[in-house]
Regions:
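Conserved, well-structured interaction surfaces
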Residues: 43-47, 51-56, 82-156, 170-173, ...
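Bacterial Sec-dependent N-terminal signal peptides
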Residues: 1-28
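Membrane-proximal, proline-rich intrinsically disordered regions
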Residues: 19-67
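Long, intrinsically disordered, low-complexity segments
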Residues: 18-21, 110-111, 182, 217
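Short, surface-exposed recognition loops and adjoining beta-strand edges that mediate ligand/DNA contacts
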Residues: 33, 60-79, 195-208
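Short linear capping/connector segments at secondary-structure termini
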Residues: 28-31, 95-96, 163-169
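Conserved small/polar residues in nucleotide/adenosyl-binding loops
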Residues: 209-218
Length: 220
């Protein structure tokens, strides 16, 4: 028995010694030190903010919410399976509880987009790589973030507001007026960096014409 305890203690000591090195190889993500080493990678990284736009006009999205609430369309129930827990009826009758799925999906879509823009701006500014289009990427992300925030204040008024990716707490709620004025300044400060004429090389990203269209709607 004594011999068994000695062997067991020896094995435990070996195992404990082997656990002191907690470093690991991560396969599910890319560390910032291993990426953003050239212009191509920074440009590709900015594309993540644009992929968020895909959810705008999907079913049960912010687009659907706005169409329903403005009476531009109506979604009838076709049998019990199409009633969708009454979420469309709630919007049509302007009796919308906080748990309505279109509200939560619209809210999440907006703030996922804002978070992506904040992260990309932070990563781009932090990168030591310098190239001609770097300021343009940052400007595009700021204008796209303004688009998302416009949707937020248009639908909800006062909302949590932050432009700091490193902020760990819950963002402070700001008034619609405060955010509106901030966005107006953000637009004016970044307009000079945007392409004014469409071309094969700038098709898709935020441009001067997009900004003007957004600014017009913003002012309305």
């Amino acid at each position: 028995m004594k011999k068994t305890n000695i062997i067991l203690s020896f094995v435990i000591c070996i195992l404990l010694y082997g656990c002191t090195d907690l470093s690991e190889t991560v396969y599910t993500g890319v560390a910032m030190n291993d990426f953003f080493k050239n212009e191509k990678e920074l440009v590709a990284n900015a594309g993540r903010a644009y992929t968020k736009l895909q959810g705008y006009n999907s079913e049960q999205s912010l687009w659907t919410l706005l169409l329903q609430a403005s009476d531009e369309c109506a979604v009838p129930a076709c049998g019990g399976s199409w009633y969708s827990n009454g979420r469309y009826e709630e919007i049509q009758t302007n009796k919308i509880p906080p748990a309505n799925k279109l509200l939560t999906r619209g809210w999440n879509w907006i703030f996922n987009g804002i978070a992506a823009c904040n992260e990309i701006i932070y990563e781009t500014e932090l990168s030591p790589i310098q190239f001609e289009g770097k300021e343009k990427i940052i400007a595009e992300m700021k204008i796209l973030r303004a688009f998302y925030y416009y949707q937020a204040i248009s639908c909800w008024g006062n909302v949590p507001f932050t432009t700091d990716y490193t902020e760990t707490g819950y963002p402070e709620q700001k008034s619609r007026e405060y955010i509106f004025n901030y966005l107006e300044k953000e637009i004016n400060d970044n307009i000079e960096f945007l392409d004014r004429e469409p071309s094969d090389t700038n098709y898709g990203p935020v441009s001067y014409t997009h900004l003007r269209a957004h600014e017009t709607r913003h002012d309305l």
